[in-house]
C-alpha cells in the first residue's frame, strides 16, 4: 500500500477545532473533508456522499450536531459513527487515518492499495488502421474487433427489459445475431435485464450454446436465474475482480466491482496491445472511484431515468410540478457529474451509451412523457467545453476505428456512420409475445389460494423490520384489479394483520400491475422488474427510503423460487385453507381496514 497525505492542518488550526463537525478544503487539490471532534477523539472522512459523490453540508435538522446532509439526494451521514442514517441501516462511510506528526500538525491519510491494472504494465503499441474497431449495436451493446478476436458487451437486442417497462430506443443492425454468433467472448456486466437479456441470449443459444460468457464474481450471481430461464448456455465463466484475464498475447481484460452496489454491479477494462478501453456501464461509483486515467476509450451511462423515483410516487410533496423540477435538476446533476468524471480521467475518446431505452408501451405514456432523459450530445458538448477529450455519440451500426482516431481525430474514416437511410430509431415493438408470458401468471392455480401471500413472504425472508406495507393488485391503469388481492404485511413480525397496528410504524402502499406482480411472485424474481420497470405506483408515510426493505427485495431474495408445487399439494391435502380478504375503506388516508377470515 501507499500512503497519501490528503490534508495537513497547522498546530493553530488543530487548536481551533471545535467540538462536533468541522469542514475543510485542501486548497491545492480542491478536495473537501470532514473532521468530527468528540473531546480528544477525532474521526475524518472525505466530504463525498457514497451514493453519487455529492457534497455534504451541515444538517440543520440535527440539533445534536453529529450529522451532515448530501446536497444531491438528501442522504444523511452520522459523522460520529460514520454510518448513514438516511436511508437508515444502509451504508458506512470510508474513514481516513488521522495522525499527528512531530511538529504537532494533523494529517489526514489515505492508505491506497496498488491499482490492479498497473500490475504487469504494457506499453502501447501502434495500431494498424482497422485493427481495433468498436461498433455500437444498441443501448449498452458494443461489438469490439480486437485484432483477430471479437468481444461483445451486454447484448440486449430484442424484447423488453424490466418486465414490460423498457424497450429499445434504437433499431439494432439487421446482422446483430450474426455478430453475436461470431464473437469469441461476451461480457455481461450485471443481472439487470437491459444487460442480461434472456430473450436475446435464447436466440444466441439456439446457434452457439457454448459461446464463452464472462461475468464478475458478484455476491448475487449474474446468472442466478439461468436454470429457470430455459436458456441453454454451457460456457459461463465467473472471474475474480481485479485480475487480468488473458485472451491471447495481445488481448486481456479485467472486471472491477462497483463501490456502491458491489453485490451486483461491475465494470470492465479491456486492453489490447497496451491500449485500454474502460467501460463503467451502470456503476454508480465504479471501483470505488479509483479508475485508470488517460485510457484510449471510455464509455459510460449518461441518461438517467433508470428508476421508478419519482415518477411512480404520489401523495405529499410528489406533485407533478415537484416531480418535473426534481427530474430536471437530477438530470443536470448527472450530466455535470459525468462531465467532471471524464475531465478528471482524461480519456482520449469518450462515448455515452447504456441509456437508449424508451417506455414505448401505450400504458406507460405518462412515464414516457415525465421521465425525460439526458441528451448525449449535450453531455458531449459539456465535456468538449471543459477538456480536449474527443467525444462520440453512437448510432446503431456506426464503427469507431481506434487506430485512426488515436493517430488523427480529424480522419474522416475514424468513425464510419451507418449507410444513409439506415433506420436509427425503432417505431414498432413486438409487445404481444412478451405480454402473453406475463398474463399467463394471472390465472395461475397458485393465486386461487390466498395463502400464497404468507407462503411468498415467508420464502422472501424479510422480517424484524418496523415497516407495514399494503400491497394492491391493479389493472393496466393502476385501478384495483377486479377480484385482485389487497392486503397488509407487517414486516416487524411477518404477520398479515386485519388493519394497521396501533404502534408507531412507517407505512407504504404499493400498487402493482397484476400481470407483473404475479409473474414476479410465481417465478421468484427480483422486484427491480416492478420498481425500475415502472410497474408500481407508491405512497409512503413518512417520506423515507427504506433501504433494507428495497435492497432485500431487489437483490437479496433467495436464489431458487418458491416451491409452488409443494404449496399446491399442501393446499389439496388441507382443503381450501384460504384466507379471504375484503377491504373496507375508511375516510382516513392510509388507514384502510381489512377483514381477514382464516377458513383453514
Curated annotation (Swiss-Prot):
**Where does this chain mainly localize?**
cytoplasm
Q: Give the subcellular location.
A: Cytoplasm
Q: Which UniProt keywords apply?
A: 2Fe-2S, Cytoplasm, Electron transport, Iron, Iron-sulfur, Metal-binding, Oxidoreductase, Transport
Cystine pairs: none
Q: Which SUPFAM superfamilies match?
A: ISP domain, Metallo-hydrolase/oxidoreductase
Q: Give me the comment on cofactor binding.
A: Binds 1 [2Fe-2S] cluster per subunit.
Binding residue positions for [2Fe-2S] cluster: 49, 51, 70, 73
Q: Which Gene3D superfamilies match?
A: Ribonuclease Z/Hydroxyacylglutathione hydrolase-like (3.60.15.10), Rieske [2Fe-2S] iron-sulphur domain (2.102.10.10)
* InterPro entries to which the protein is assigned, alphabetical: CMP-Neu5Ac_hydroxylase_Rieske (IPR037339), Cnh (IPR027033), RibonucZ/Hydroxyglut_hydro (IPR036866), Rieske_2Fe-2S (IPR017941), Rieske_2Fe-2S_sf (IPR036922)
Biochemical pathway: Amino-sugar metabolism; N-acetylneuraminate metabolism
Question: What does the record give as the reaction this protein catalyses?
Answer: CMP-N-acetyl-beta-neuraminate + 2 Fe(II)-[cytochrome b5] + O2 + 2 H(+) = CMP-N-glycoloyl-beta-neuraminate + 2 Fe(III)-[cytochrome b5] + H2O
What family does the database annotate? Belongs to the CMP-Neu5Ac hydroxylase family.
Q: Kindly give the PANTHER family that the UniProt entry links to this protein.
A: CYTIDINE MONOPHOSPHATE-N-ACETYLNEURAMINIC ACID HYDROXYLASE, INACTIVE CYTIDINE MONOPHOSPHATE-N-ACETYLNEURAMINIC ACID HYDROXYLASE
Put simply, this protein is called Cytidine monophosphate-N-acetylneuraminic acid hydroxylase
Amino acid at each position: 500500500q501507499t500512503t497519501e497525505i490528503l490534508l495537513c492542518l497547522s498546530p493553530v488550526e488543530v487548536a481551533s477545532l471545535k467540538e462536533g463537525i468541522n469542514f475543510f478544503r485542501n486548497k491545492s487539490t480542491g478536495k473537501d473533508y470532514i473532521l468530527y471532534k468528540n473531546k480528544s477523539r477525532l474521526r475524518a472522512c472525505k466530504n463525498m456522499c457514497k451514493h453519487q459523490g455529492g457534497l455534504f453540508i451541515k444538517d440543520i435538522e440535527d440539533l445534536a450536531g453529529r450529522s451532515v446532509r448530501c446536497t444531491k439526494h438528501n442522504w444523511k451521514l452520522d459523522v460520529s459513527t460514520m454510518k448513514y442514517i438516511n436511508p437508515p441501516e444502509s451504508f458506512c462511510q470510508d474513514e481516513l487515518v488521522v495522525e499527528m506528526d512531530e511538529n504537532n500538525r494533523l494529517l489526514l491519510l489515505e492508505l491506497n492499495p496498488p491499482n490492479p491494472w498497473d500490475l504487469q504494465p504494457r506499453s502501447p503499441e501502434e495500431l494498424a488502421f482497422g485493427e481495433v474497431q468498436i461498433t455500437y449495436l444498441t443501448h449498452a451493446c458494443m461489438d469490439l474487433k480486437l485484432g483477430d478476436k471479437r468481444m461483445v458487451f451486454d447484448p440486449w437486442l430484442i424484447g423488453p427489459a424490466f418486465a414490460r417497462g423498457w424497450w429499445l430506443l434504437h433499431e439494432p443492425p439487421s446482422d446483430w445475431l450474426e455478430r453475436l454468433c461470431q464473437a469469441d467472448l461476451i461480457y455481461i456486466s450485471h443481472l439487470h435485464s437491459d444487460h442480461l437479456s434472456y430473450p436475446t441470449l435464447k436466440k444466441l443459444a439456439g446457434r452457439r450454446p457454448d459461446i464463452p460468457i464472462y461475468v464478475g464474481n458478484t455476491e448475487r450471481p449474474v446468472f442466478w436465474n439461468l436454470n429457470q430461464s430455459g436458456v441453454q448456455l454451457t460456457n459461463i465463466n465467473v472471474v475474480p475482480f481485479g485480475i487480468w484475464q488473458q485472451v491471447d498475447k495481445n488481448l486481456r481484460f479485467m472486471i472491477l466491482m462497483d463501490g456502491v452496489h458491489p453485490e451486483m454491479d461491475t465494470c470492465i477494462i479491456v486492453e489490447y496491445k497496451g491500449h485500454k478501453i474502460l467501460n463503467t456501464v451502470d456503476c454508480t461509483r465504479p471501483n470505488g472511484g479509483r479508475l485508470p486515467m488517460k485510457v484510449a476509450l471510455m464509455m459510460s451511462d449518461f441518461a438517467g431515468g433508470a428508476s421508478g423515483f419519482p415518477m411512480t410516487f404520489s401523495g405529499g410533496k410528489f406533485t407533478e410540478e415537484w416531480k418535473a423540477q426534481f427530474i430536471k435538476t437530477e438530470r443536470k446533476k448527472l450530466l455535470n457529474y459525468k462531465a467532471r468524471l471524464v475531465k478528471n480521467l482524461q480519456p482520449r475518446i469518450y462515448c455515452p451509451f447504456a441509456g437508449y431505452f424508451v417506455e414505448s408501451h401505450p400504458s406507460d405514456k405518462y412515464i414516457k412523457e415525465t421521465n425525460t432523459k439526458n441528451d448525449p450530445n449535450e453531455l458531449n458538448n459539456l465535456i468538449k467545453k471543459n477538456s480536449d477529450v474527443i467525444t462520440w455519440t453512437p448510432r446503431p451500426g456506426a464503427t469507431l476505428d481506434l487506430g485512426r482516431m488515436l493517430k488523427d481525430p480529424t480522419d474522416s474514416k475514424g468513425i464510419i456512420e451507418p449507410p444513409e437511410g439506415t433506420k436509427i430509431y425503432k417505431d414498432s415493438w413486438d409487445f404481444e409475445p412478451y405480454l402473453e408470458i406475463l398474463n399467463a401468471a394471472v390465472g395461475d392455480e397458485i393465486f386461487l389460494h390466498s395463502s400464497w401471500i404468507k407462503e411468498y413472504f415467508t420464502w422472501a425472508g424479510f422480517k424484524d423490520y418496523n415497516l407495514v406495507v399494503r400491497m394492491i393488485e391493479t389493472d393496466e391503469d393502476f385501478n384495483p384489479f377486479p377480484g385482485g388481492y389487497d392486503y397488509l404485511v407487517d414486516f416487524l413480525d411477518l404477520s398479515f394483520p386485519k388493519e394497521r397496528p396501533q404502534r408507531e410504524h412507517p407505512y407504504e402502499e404499493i400498487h402493482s400491475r397484476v400481470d407483473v406482480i404475479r409473474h414476479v411472485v410465481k417465478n421468484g424474481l427480483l422486484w427491480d422488474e416492478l420498481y425500475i420497470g415502472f410497474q408500481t405506483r407508491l405512497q409512503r408515510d413518512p417520506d423515507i427510503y427504506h433501504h433494507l426493505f428495497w435492497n432485500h427485495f431487489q437483490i437479496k431474495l433467495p436464489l431458487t423460487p418458491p416451491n409452488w408445487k409443494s404449496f399446491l399439494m399442501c393446499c389439496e391435502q388441507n382443503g381450501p385453507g384460504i384466507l379471504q380478504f375484503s377491504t373496507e375503506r375508511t375516510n382516513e388516508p392510509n388507514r384502510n381496514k381489512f377483514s381477514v377470515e382464516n377458513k383453514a
